[in-house]
């Protein structure tokens, strides 16, 4: 019990800036230690054939109300819609914007590369070789069940039972995004736990587990792998990074197991990521095979309602019926189409339609834009 109190109190003191409700997450691209990847000199160059879209323009022009600050639509191998109204504080940071939970999907994408590079055998392995999980319900589970948010952890964390995806049993200062995962797993509240009946349960701990397991398996090659994914494979133009769970002044205390899914990139590099995923799928690369495998093993969300969130707002998260490998699938009304969705707090969206070759990338300060009009309507076009 003393250990539990000490760790949680220390976490509260060191990370008080970021322990507000998830809905009030501040813009802080440089406040935390990073796993940083530099831009490629051979970055992917887009072609454009721009058209004006009145619906998108209206939402962008009214960004103070809608929250929409960036919209990109890519199809026919060209950027067709490109509109933005970035605040100055984002512009002076080279247009860098947070992924929020879009980063969950990017962790999976990196994990797929780790499998392709031979660091991890496959998605069906059992997690019995990592001491960090000792004593917890996660020890001995299959990797695919963690990928699918299907680990039977709903009594302890997640949106199935609690009001947050990142706080253990909804306790404000037990935010798994703000202290190393080994510390989280050693808390009394997670020790000697048993899994419940598996059910889709969206939460941040599963993703941070995946990321730190990948760090563990890659060892000294972790940042080399990140460079291979984003610099060499995606060919980003500018710096991108994952935040760590420790702030800069505190990073030396925890040299390992500090991975978290919070990702930063500019708008065009998010599109480059989407384009690379589209190409992986279409060209049946090793990573493309990974994406197809998690698509085949996706599970039902079994939500009571698909009528938006508690505020009546929609996105790919709330308007899709299945989940696989940290991605949203089976958009309502389009379930026959192979559409992969990434979704983050505040309306961040990266959506890839493998059947049409269309990619939509959206960034917002909050989710009050008309998602059905500027995203879903575009997806329905053939």
Language model segments and positions:
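N-terminal leader/targeting segments and the immediately adjacent pre-domain N-terminus
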Residues: 17-92, 116-121, 148, 216, ...
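Active-site-proximal loop and beta-strand segments within enzyme catalytic domains
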Residues: 36, 61, 90-99, 103, ...
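Catalytic-site signature segments of enzymes, centered on catalytic residues
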Residues: 93-94, 159-247, 261
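Active-site-proximal alpha-helical segments within enzyme catalytic domains
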Residues: 206-213, 261-283, 348-364
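Active-site Gly/Thr loop motif
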Residues: 236-238, 243, 248-250, 255, ...
């Amino acid at each position: 019990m003393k250990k539990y109190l000490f760790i949680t109190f220390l976490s509260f003191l060191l990370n008080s800036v970021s322990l507000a409700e998830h809905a009030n997450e501040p813009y802080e691209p440089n406040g935390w230690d990073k796993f940083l990847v530099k831009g490629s000199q051979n970055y992917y160059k887009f072609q454009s054939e721009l058209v004006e879209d009145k619906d998108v323009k209206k939402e962008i022009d009214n960004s103070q109300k809608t929250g929409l600050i960036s919209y990109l639509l890519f199809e026919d191998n060209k950027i067709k819609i490109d509109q933005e109204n970035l605040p100055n504080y984002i512009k002076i940071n080279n247009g860098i914007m947070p992924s929020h939970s879009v980063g969950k999907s990017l962790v999976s994408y990196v994990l797929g590369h780790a499998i392709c590079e031979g660091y991890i055998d496959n998605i069906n392995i059992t997690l019995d070789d990592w001491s960090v999980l000792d004593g917890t319900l996660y020890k001995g589970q299959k990797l695919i069940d963690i990928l699918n948010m299907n680990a039977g952890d709903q009594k302890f964390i997640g949106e199935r039972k609690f009001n947050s995806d990142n706080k253990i049993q909804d306790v404000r200062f037990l935010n798994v995004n703000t202290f190393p995962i080994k510390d989280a797993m050693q808390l009394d509240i997670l020790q000697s736990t048993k899994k419940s009946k598996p059910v889709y349960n969206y939460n941040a701990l599963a993703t941070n587990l995946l990321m730190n397991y990948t760090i563990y398996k890659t060892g000294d090659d972790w940042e080399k792998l990140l460079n291979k994914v984003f610099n060499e494979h995606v060919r980003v133009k500018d710096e991108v990074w994952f935040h760590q769970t420790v702030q800069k002044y505190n990073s030396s205390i925890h040299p390992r197991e500090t991975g978290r899914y919070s990702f930063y990139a500019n708008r065009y590099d998010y599109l480059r990521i989407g384009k690379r995923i589209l190409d992986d799928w279409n060209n049946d690369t090793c990573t493309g095979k990974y994406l197809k495998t998690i698509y085949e093993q996706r599970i039902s969300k079994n939500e009571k309602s698909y009528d938006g969130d508690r505020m009546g707002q929609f996105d790919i998260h709330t308007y899709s019926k299945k989940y696989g490998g940290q991605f949203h699938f089976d958009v309502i009304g389009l379930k026959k189409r192979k559409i992969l969705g990434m979704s983050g707090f505040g309306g961040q969206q990266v959506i890839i339609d493998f059947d049409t070759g269309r990619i939509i990338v959206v960034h917002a300060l909050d989710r009050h834009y008309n998602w059905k009009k500027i995203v879903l309507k575009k997806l329905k076009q053939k």
